[in-house]
Amino acid sequence: MQDIKTYLSTAPVLTTLWFGSLAGLLIEINRLFPDALSFPFFSS
């Protein structure tokens, strides 16, 4: 029972940290290397 409580308390924390770091990484990649969808807006 203690293992289940430990799993339920750590899985959301680890998932939040993982998705937060993944989102930050994707934001920084798109900031440094913007995709082609943003080119028409800045070319005018």
From Swiss-Prot:
Name the InterPro entries on file.
Answer: PSI_PsaJ, PSI_PsaJ_sf
**Does Thylakoid count among this protein's keywords?**
yes
Annotated membrane topology: Single-pass membrane protein
- What keywords are assigned to this protein? Chloroplast, Membrane, Photosynthesis, Photosystem I, Plastid, Thylakoid, Transmembrane, Transmembrane helix
Write out the annotated subcellular location.
Plastid, Chloroplast thylakoid membrane
List, alphabetically, the GO terms of the cellular component aspect: chloroplast thylakoid membrane; photosystem I
Which spans are transmembrane here?
A: 7-27
Biological process GO terms, please? Answer: photosynthesis
Q: Highest taxon of the source? A: Eukaryota
- Coiled-coil stretches are none
Q: Which family does it belong to?
A: Belongs to the PsaJ family.
Give the function comment from the record: May help in the organization of the PsaE and PsaF subunits.
Protein's UniProt name: Photosystem I reaction center subunit IX
User: Which species is this record about?
Assistant: Phalaenopsis aphrodite subsp. formosana (Moth orchid)
